[in-house]
């Protein structure tokens, strides 16, 4: 049996971020072989990950990746259990790897992503990376969702508040316009706008019909509760719906950097200055943990259950 030195244990720990005693045992179990030791730790990590599967991962980050010419982009939400871990370099680095994978490998969905070979190391799948990260970080790690755009125009991404909010927007423009700095700035400003103002659609035609009808019902009930005459209620509702459109439609929102302009008028200015036709195709906005019910621990109840 090969002699296990402290240097061998240290090297394994640096490569895996696993605990010192686990690394020592892995070296012993693998007779000093590095690759077998890493495999042993990964197998151990899989059982650890299973123990963590029931935990709720509602913290984390939204990460992004765009290719060099800005024609392909991706945003992903990767979750962990605590805000402390979400701020660590290890976790953020892992999330960035996943964003790169989505952009370059174009998976159909999260399940397909998990099965893909990692673009930077084909000997591992993304599922392997998740398991490795779980071992190294010590919390449940999960890839929740992603969005990917590919275009002949411009894709711009923006990450706000250290990964709490992530935005991606696609703008159509010809090749000459894509290289224009004003167009690039406009696309970036759009991403900022979406992060701050939370639009629900690009234009009126894209507003969810069911949600719009519900809004009309609410506005009508409000007007009637205010004692307004029935004959003017419909006109009031239409007026308030106009205001609603200005809140939820990106093109009709006031520009966050200049409230005297709408996004539509700003786009017209940029198109004229750049000598190019511009249009906003779509956007994605992810907010970390939205829709996930966070666990509320009841320590007394847990202790009582353990003593039964």
Say what each PLM segment does.
Residues 2-308:
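N-terminal assembly/interaction segments in proteins that build large macromolecular machines
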């Amino acid at each position: 049996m090969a002699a296990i030195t402290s240097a061998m244990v240290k090297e394994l720990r640096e490569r895996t971020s696993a605990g010192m005693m686990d690394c020592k045992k892995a070296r012993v179990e693998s007779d000093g072989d590095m690759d077998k030791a890493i495999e042993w730790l990964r197998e151990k990590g899989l059982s650890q990950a299973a123990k963590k599967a029931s935990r709720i991962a509602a913290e984390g980050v939204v990460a992004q990746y765009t290719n060099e010419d800005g024609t392909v982009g991706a945003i992903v939400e990767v979750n962990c259990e605590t805000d402390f871990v979400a701020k660590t370099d290890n976790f953020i680095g892992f999330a960035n790897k996943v964003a790169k994978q989505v952009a370059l490998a174009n998976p159909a969905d999260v399940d397909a992503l998990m099965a893909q070979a990692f673009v930077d190391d084909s000997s591992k799948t993304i599922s392997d990376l998740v398991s490795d990260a779980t071992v190294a970080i010590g919390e449940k790690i999960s890839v929740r969702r992603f969005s990917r755009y590919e275009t002949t125009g411009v894709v711009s991404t923006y990450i706000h508040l250290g990964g709490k909010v992530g935005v991606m927007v696609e703008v159509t423009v010809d090749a000459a316009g894509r290289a224009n700095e004003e167009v690039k700035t406009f696309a970036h400003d759009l991403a900022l706008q979406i992060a701050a103002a939370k639009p629900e659609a690009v234009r009126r035609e894209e507003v969810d019909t069911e949600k719009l009808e519900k809004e009309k019902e609410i506005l009508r009930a409000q007007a009637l509760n205010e004692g307004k005459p029935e004959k003017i209620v419909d006109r009031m509702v239409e007026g308030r719906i106009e205001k609603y459109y200005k809140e939820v439609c990106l093109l009709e929102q006031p520009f966050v950097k200049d409230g005297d302009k709408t996004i539509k008028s700003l786009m017209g200015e940029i198109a004229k200055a750049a000598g190019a036709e511009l249009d906003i195709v779509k956007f994605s906005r992810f907010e970390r943990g939205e829709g996930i019910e966070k666990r509320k621990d009841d320590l007394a109840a847990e202790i009582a259950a353990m003593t039964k």
